[in-house]
């Protein structure tokens, strides 16, 4: 896996360094044979994208970053998704990085739409589902999520074709690292 254009000459920590109290820098490694195209980011509550997500070619890693809104005591949360071009699905990542750790924790979720589902719903639909909804959901989007406060154990979503493994730090300038890859013995998608 080699760095793509968004990480050329910088690091994930470098993407997160915006001078804001709450930021989230996200790196995705694509171990599949499918390009991850048409990134769609939805940042909640007037948060800002400081580096835009980009397509992720097979064998590459790319990064982007978001921050809390200016002049507010809020965190940053949202979703980003990419189409697995050729697999006719979307890979979806949800994050929540709060302003106050006295009452809230960092959360991250990863998942995939069912085959044939590539459309992105409007607004916060995926965020609300992945943050508040049951993880045994049998709808168009299937996912796992985890809390990153006392532990930073990975969150793993797996189906018959793909496995997504993600970690998130438990600090205000959060770093998220995610790998999407074929499941074991699924060499056709490698």
UniProtKB/Swiss-Prot annotation:
Main location: secreted
Motif Cell attachment site, crucial for protein stability location, chain numbering: 138-140
Intracellular or extracellular location(s): Secreted; Nematocyst; Target cell membrane
One biological process term in Gene Ontology: killing of cells of another organism
Species the sequence originates in: Terebra anilis
PANTHER family linked: BRYOPORIN
Tissue: Expressed by the venom duct.
Cellular component per GO, a single term: other organism cell membrane
Sequence similarity: Belongs to the actinoporin family. Conoidea subfamily.
Gene3D superfamilies membership: Cytolysin/lectin
A GO MF label: toxin activity
Subunit-structure text: Octamer or nonamer in membranes. Monomer in the soluble state.
Record-given protein name: Tereporin-Ca1
Function of the protein: Pore-forming protein that forms pores of around 1 nm and causes cardiac stimulation and cytolysis.
UniProt keywords, alphabetically: Cytolysis, Ion transport, Membrane, Nematocyst, Secreted, Target cell membrane, Target membrane, Toxin, Transmembrane, Transport
Binding-site positions, phosphocholine: 78, 96, 98, 131-132
